[in-house]
A protein has these predicted regions:
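Short, flexible helical or helix-coil boundary motifs
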Residues: 46, 50-53, 66, 81, ...
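C-terminal motif of bacterial Sec signal peptides marking the signal peptidase cleavage site
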Residues: 2-3
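Acidic, glycine-rich loop-and-strand cores that form catalytic or ligand-binding grooves
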Residues: 91-131
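Short, well-ordered alpha-helical segments enriched in acidic and aromatic residues
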Residues: 53-99
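Helix N-terminus capping/helix-initiation residues
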Residues: 64, 90-93, 111-113, 170, ...
Length: 222
């Protein structure tokens, strides 16, 4: 016989535990703790992979899709940008381009492809900046991870995105943060990012190569 609301049909659920706000909060905190541990583990594995010159597919697995697309775009810019276009670049972009052209001109490549990837991770010195400082604790907020300096942990210098099941480095957003202090030099001297890029290039390579000058602002016949 059919009953009213709350009849025997529904009574089976009456004794089932209801997930309280406290339980949901505890579950959320546990998930966040797991994600934080995964972020810390991912970063250590990334550093180890870079140190050991892992294959390109391994390295790209640590980067966001937007970072991979940006690397392809930047490599194309290294092949076609002239001096006028170079003046539109941020320092880290301009430095990657002139360094890429130096490697091309002096036949320094030891990889057949994904050259901009290897250039930025191994030869640019950008990640060395991070290795030389004391890092603060990693932090996460929903699907965004970050880490700052120990002296100012709330100011990030590296950013990460949660990609369904794992963390990935957002290289596009990280490089401007890493090089922010260097870019301050350009502002003080009223230099463009491209001019500062040449200054940095000369500091690193002036004892090894000649013509570290504006000739690198032009395509060199790729």
């Amino acid at each position: 016989m059919a009953g009213c609301a709350g009849s025997s049909k529904d009574s089976g659920n009456a004794n089932e535990p209801v997930e309280t706000a406290a339980v949901r909060d505890a579950k959320f905190k546990a998930q966040e703790a797991d994600k934080l541990a995964m972020l810390e583990s991912m970063y250590e594995l990334f550093k180890s992979s870079v140190k050991n010159r892992a294959p390109s597919d391994v390295l790209l697995g640590f980067l966001t899709d937007s970072s991979e697309y940006w690397l392809d775009t930047l490599e194309n810019h290294a092949k076609i940008y002239d001096a006028t276009a170079m003046d539109t670049c941020q320092f880290y972009e301009a430095y990657a381009i002139v360094l890429y052209r130096l490697f091309e001109r002096e036949h320094l490549w030891d990889v057949p492809d994904y050259r901009m990837l290897y250039l930025l991770l191994y030869n640019s010195g950008f990640l060395d900046v991070v290795d030389r400082v004391n890092m603060g604790p990693f932090e996460i907020k929903n699907d965004r991870g970050s880490v700052g300096l120990a002296s100012s942990p709330k100011v990030p210098i590296m950013l990460f995105d949660w990609d369904d099941t794992k963390w990935k480095l957002d290289l596009v957003e990280t490089l401007p943060l890493i090089t922010k202090g260097v870019e301050a030099t350009a502002a003080k001297k009223n230099w463009t990012g491209a001019r500062l890029a040449l200054y940095w290039l000369d500091k690193k390579y002036h004892l090894q190569y000649s013509r570290l000058d504006e000739s690198l602002f032009e395509p060199i016949g790729f």
